[in-house]
């Protein structure tokens, strides 16, 4: 990361000069190339991903830290080009926590906690797509809402306990109702390495399925080089057919500071479908001097609840951070 720190007078616009003694501009970036396949009948794909993030942070006379960031994030896989992404502003106070408004690319609490199982690279359900519909649909999962115009609050940790909440109005969700969720994370000070979390929210699944309660709970424990975790999630809709459940577990092992491996499993029970979707995956990553080589090899049985629709997927990526 390259940083430019301004002390005293600034060459920027006069409206920023008053904050220049306490402000910092930073630019960070990354680039990656990858090869992979999303299902058995899929041809090998290649893609390139580039990301540059501009961050401006300053402290007001009242002690608030204000940070605004804009990410230029694009990938090219033969059909898509670059784009702007992740535009946000954060207002933080040591005693009161952080309020974030994401004009683009925001994450709700459920969206960020949809799968927090330990992994060296990708989740066990990731990458795989359904060959039956032309590889346009990925594996079924339970998650919250994310996207544009999203507010989020993250409290400071008090005794290892922190509170989190998110809100997105109906104009942004595109549904009849707004979206909101909240969660609590516990990292008990008396048990080193343990983390427990619970989050719940409500959203509209479609124009006819309204008021779906979504929730997740998880526990992770790190001991030495090993981390293990277990997670359960639920979409509780107005009928049995619109009520879905999932559970997942994972274990990772840090061989050393540079090399990590992991294995995980994920099961999704769709209330409207008979066979459960069952996924498993192995990941590995090796980092040296800002360069990372990552790989994931996943397989899913009954993709999207279709019996005997079994698919394998993989991805190998080379990424650079600067």
Predicted regions and their residues:
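Outer-membrane beta-barrel proteins
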Residues: 1-322
């Amino acid at each position: 990361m390259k940083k430019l720190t301004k002390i005293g007078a600034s060459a920027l616009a006069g409206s920023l000069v008053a904050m220049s003694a306490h402000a910092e501009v930073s630019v960070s970036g990354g680039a990656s190339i990858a090869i992979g396949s999303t299902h058995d009948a899929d041809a090998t794909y290649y893609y390139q991903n580039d990301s540059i993030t501009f961050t401006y942070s300053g402290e007001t006379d009242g002690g608030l830290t204000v940070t605004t960031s804009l990410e230029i994030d694009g990938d090219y896989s033969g059909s898509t080009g670059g784009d702007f992404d992740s535009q946000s502003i954060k207002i933080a106070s040591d005693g009161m926590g952080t309020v974030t408004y994401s004009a683009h690319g925001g994450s709700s609490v459920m969206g960020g906690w949809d799968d927090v199982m330990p992994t060296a690279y990708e989740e066990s359900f990731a990458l795989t797509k359904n060959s039956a519909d032309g590889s346009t649909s990925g594996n079924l999962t339970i998650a919250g809402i994310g996207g544009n115009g999203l507010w989020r609050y993250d409290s400071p940790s008090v005794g290892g306990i922190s509170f989190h909440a998110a809100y997105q109005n109906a104009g942004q969700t595109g549904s009849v109702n707004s979206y909101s969720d909240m969660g609590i994370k516990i990292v008990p000070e008396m048990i080193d390495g343990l983390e427990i979390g619970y989050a719940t929210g409500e959203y509209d699944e479609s124009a006819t399925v309204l008021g779906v309660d979504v929730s997740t709970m998880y526990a992770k424990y790190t001991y030495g080089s090993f981390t293990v975790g277990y997670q359960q999630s639920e979409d509780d809709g107005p009928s049995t057919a619109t009520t879905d459940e999932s559970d997942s577990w994972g274990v990772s092992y840090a061989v050393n500071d540079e090399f990590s491996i992991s294995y995980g499993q994920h099961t999704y029970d769709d209330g409207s479908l008979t066979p459960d979707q069952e996924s498993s995956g192995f990941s590995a990553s090796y980092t040296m001097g800002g360069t990372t080589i990552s790989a994931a090899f996943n397989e899913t049985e009954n993709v999207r609840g279709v019996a005997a629709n079994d698919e394998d997927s993989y991805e190998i990526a080379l990424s650079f951070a600067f």
